[in-house]
From Swiss-Prot:
Cellular component terms (Gene Ontology): cytoplasm
Annotated EC: 2.7.7.3
UniProt cross-references to InterPro entries, sorted A to Z: Cyt_trans-like, PPAT, Rossmann-like_a/b/a_fold
Subunit structure: Homohexamer.
Origin species: Aeromonas salmonicida (strain A449)
Descriptive protein name: Phosphopantetheine adenylyltransferase
Pathway field: Cofactor biosynthesis; coenzyme A biosynthesis; CoA from (R)-pantothenate: step 4/5
One example of a Gene Ontology biological process annotation: coenzyme A biosynthetic process
Top enzyme category: transferase
Residues holding substrate: T10, K42, L74, R88
Amino acid sequence: MTNKVIYPGTFDPITNGHTDLIGRAARLFDEVVVGVANSPSKRPLFDLAERVLLARQVTAHLPNVKVVGFSGLLVDFAKEQQANVLIRGLRAVSDFEYEFQLANMNRRLMPELESVFLTPAEENSFISSTLVKEVALHGGDIRQFVDPIVAKAIAAKQGK
């Protein structure tokens, strides 16, 4: 069995914080599966296919990373991918409680599923997809928070 990990998220859009964690996970694990969740209830800016494409483009330089879209329960996706480790990012103490609940629920649904938490690089610790979209909506410069491919895609979505 290979040392495979899943990094799940909505990635709407994928940020430099996400790509930093993906790159670090790629050094720690044999294979990293970036699981892009459908999450229609979050009313994403980009549809699932667009988010998968953007994630593939910004991780193309990492040979042991693959990007896959999924719907449904994360534990079912983990079983499908034959992975028993998840990575999650913790930006602040405030993230911990929610992530702790998720980890326990996932472990209850799939006892062999472990959650590994990574903290972001300091320069990425405040970046969130929500904040990036908010800054872009109000005409702010998001180029320091996302890959140029993502910045261009956001501008195109906003008709700029």
